[in-house]
UniProtKB/Swiss-Prot annotation:
This is Purkinje cell protein 2 homolog. Residues 23-45, 63-85 form the GoLoco domain. Residues 1-64, 86-136 are annotated as: Disordered. Pfam families: GoLoco. May function as a cell-type specific modulator for G protein-mediated cell signaling. Keywords: Phosphoprotein, Repeat. The lineage of its organism: Eukaryota, Metazoa, Chordata, Craniata, Vertebrata. It comes from Homo sapiens (Human).
Amino acid sequence: MMDQEEKTEEGSGPCAEAGSPDQEGFFNLLSHVQGDRMEGQRCSLQAGPGQTTKSQSDPTPEMDSLMDMLASTQGRRMDDQRVTVSSLPGFQPVGSKDGAQKRAGTLSPQPLLTPQDPTALGFRRNSSPQPPTQAP
């Protein structure tokens, strides 16, 4: 009676054995089927003997215009997401009368900032004012 309880505690059932013939057969079948699926999805990228591939150094005009349009569109999207900062602590805007200078090729202004006071650039761990504390 005690021997049967010890065997069930150890978990020695037909599925718990490592490397049982049923498990080995299942994993062999699974490996074979998955291997066939992978082979079926492969394609050969080599050109045949009579075929020549087009040189990648000669992009078509359509591809050039597509890439130009894509770069322009993405540039405008980036410009739309930019934030203009009117003032930063320790800095004063320098440049045109609105405090910003247009960057070449973009529609958004880029502020030019110079430090007002070098000591103002020291970053403190907690720069917010603390309320006064009273002793208990």
